UniProtKB/Swiss-Prot annotation:
This is Pentatricopeptide repeat-containing protein At1g52640, mitochondrial. One of its GO terms (cellular component) is mitochondrion. Keywords: Mitochondrion, Repeat, Transit peptide. PPR repeats lie at residues 101-135, 137-171, 172-206, 207-241, 242-276, 277-311, 312-346, 347-381, 382-416, 417-452. Residues 509-523 have a biased composition (Acidic residues). Belongs to the PPR family. P subfamily. It is found in: Mitochondrion. InterPro entries: Pentatricopeptide_rpt, TPR-like_helical_dom_sf. Residues 1-5 form a transit peptide. Its main location: mitochondrion. NCBIfam families: PPR (TIGR00756). PANTHER family: PENTATRICOPEPTIDE REPEAT-CONTAINING PROTEIN 3, MITOCHONDRIAL.
Length: 523
């Protein structure tokens, strides 16, 4: 029944006059959208995730202010809201004298792909081809390749390549490279290698770059023999074997544990007149760091200095993370200073590696000082930074400092997600005398229209019932029932002690917080 409802809704939304022609220029492009308006419409989409929700009726009030620029910004903000974002896009297209930008079409393809709405994606592309809404270029298919690869559907990615001709596109070597790169990036290397073998039947001549992509793919899954076979085939076909190809094989050897073989390859590169670059040295640094051998990593770093080569931020981050794992946080700070001197500006991951050490060791003063240092260097904390610091502060009872950091989030352009709210609520619930404050954060989350995890609702309800505060349970449940978010409304029954018939929302249900782990025993 639900499938029929969704299908009929999509068909109704697609009913657009056939006479509408493609216009590549954005409507009202000169009028930048208000950030508040973008936030407001994004909130509406978030609150209307259910296919049965009357999203279009709610959007009517915004019609006079809709521009192609606004649509782009909303779509970028709502990349994790596949179905409502699609409905919003189709609704905007029906506004008189409105035309989407080419960028908006590409963003929507990416949204539908990342949310695994592949049936909708192909319907959208077929309809766009029929009515000539926008030019379906190779770049659109590159987005589709990446989406299928991320969804662990490598065979479908290959089928998408074969369907390019249906849309008037003759695949070329660049398209093949993009497909192979997408597959290898998600470790579907065997599928990539198999499809590569069939590519000759399409009349596509592989380039040196094509071979290098496959070699890097085998390196990614630590298979040096597979990488060597591709490399040897490259030589047999008289391809120009450049530094990129040698680095790829070097990476494969080192990642598979054959660092000695990698060093021999490194020497061979020099004999052939290939001058190693920073990445060539970085391969050894990463290999030594993975083995926990910081001393050898530093020796390679010193050798790079002699050649006036500077590692990139990613390589510095790898060393810093290894130093912290080896309890050498002071050396990590020295390397942090060296990064800045070399012009490799530390990023959030750099600071998070050190922050994780301080939080694991309950070094609250050093953690807060590091947060201040991030402010001075204009490096914005992310959700990992905040979650680590807030967990630490609540764990040791520094509630005043936790509140101060929470209130400063908006100044750092960070807006709490469900994971960050969960850190506060779960932590405070377990602290004596902080149940009321936990309820306050729960109410803030409900007011923001952010659906809580089922475990959060259950924990808070059980604690309130245990303290005989059923009146507070009723207040919270009533607030959830009145929420503008349909998802929050659905969860009100859990606050009232009943189980929903639909699947429960867990900590792993948010793509945005897929690597968030709730510390049940340490808060």
């Amino acid at each position: 029944m639900a499938i029929r409802t969704v299908s009929s809704l999509v068909r109704a939304l697609y009913q657009t006059p056939k006479s509408q022609s493609f216009r590549i220029f954005s409507t009202l492009l000169h009028d930048p959208p208000s950030p508040d308006l973008v936030n407001e419409i994004s909130r509406v989409l978030s609150d209307h995730r259910n296919p049965k929700d009357d999203l279009e009726h709610t959007l009517v009030a915004y019609s006079p202010r809709v521009s192609s620029n606004l649509v782009e910004q909303v779509l970028k903000r709502c990349k994790n809201l596949g179905f409502p974002a699609h409905r919003f896009f189709l609704w905007a297209r029906r506004i008189p004298d409105f035309a989407h930008s080419l960028e908006s079409y590409h963003i929507l393809v990416e949204i539908l792909g990342s949310s695994k709405q592949f049936a909708l994606l192909w319907d959208f592309l077929i309809e766009a081809r029929e009515y000539n809404y926008f030019e379906i270029s190779s770049k659109v298919f590159w987005i589709v390749f990446r989406a299928y690869s991320r969804a662990n559907l490598p065979s479908e990615a290959c089928r998408a390549f074969n369907r390019m001709v249906e849309f008037g596109i003759k695949p070329c070597v660049d398209d093949l490279d993009q497909l192979l790169h997408s597959l290898c990036d998600k470790k579907h290397v065997n599928h990539a290698q198999e499809f590569f073998g069939k590519a000759k039947g399409f009349g596509i001549v592989p380039s040196a770059k094509t071979y290098s992509i496959l070699v890097r793919g085998w390196a990614r899954i630590r298979d040096a023999s597979g990488a060597r076979k591709v490399f040897d085939e490259m030589l047999e076909r008289n391809c120009v074997v450049d530094l990129l190809a040698y680095n790829a094989l070097l990476d494969a050897l080192c990642k598979s544990g054959d660092v000695d073989g990698g060093y021999k390859m490194f020497q061979e590169m020099g004999n052939l007149g290939l001058k190693p670059d920073a990445y060539s040295f970085a391969i050894f640094i990463h290999a030594y760091c993975d083995a926990g051998d910081v001393h050898s990593a530093y020796k390679v770093l010193d050798r790079m200095k002699r050649y006036d080569l500077v590692p990139n931020v990613y390589t510095f981050n790898h060393i810093i993370k290894t130093l912290c794992k080896n309890e050498k946080v002071d050396d990590a700070y020295l390397l942090l200073d060296e990064m800045i001197q070399k012009g490799a500006n530390p990023d959030t991951w750099t600071y998070n590696s050190i922050m994780a050490y301080h939080c694991d060791h309950c070094e609250v003063n050093r953690a807060t000082k590091l947060l201040s240092r991030m402010d001075r260097t204009k490096c914005l904390p992310d959700r990992h930074t905040y979650n680590m610091v807030l967990k630490l502060l609540i764990r040791i009872g520094r509630f005043d400092r936790a509140t101060e950091i929470w209130e400063g989030m908006s100044e750092r352009k960070f807006y709490p997600t469900v994971a960050t709210y969960t850190v506060m609520i779960h932590g405070l619930v377990r602290k004596k005398g902080k149940l009321e404050e936990a309820c306050r954060y729960f109410e803030m989350m409900i007011d923001e229209g952010i659906p809580p995890y089922s475990t959060t609702v259950e924990m808070l309800r059980n604690r309130l019932v245990g303290w005989g505060q059923m009146d507070v349970v009723d207040v919270l449940a009533g607030k959830m029932e009145r929420s503008s978010s349909c998802s929050v409304q659905d969860m009100a029954v859990e606050m009232r002690g009943k189980r929903r018939r639909l699947g429960r929302r867990s900590e792993n249900s948010e793509d945005d917080d897929d690597d968030f782990e709730l510390e049940r025993d340490t808060i």
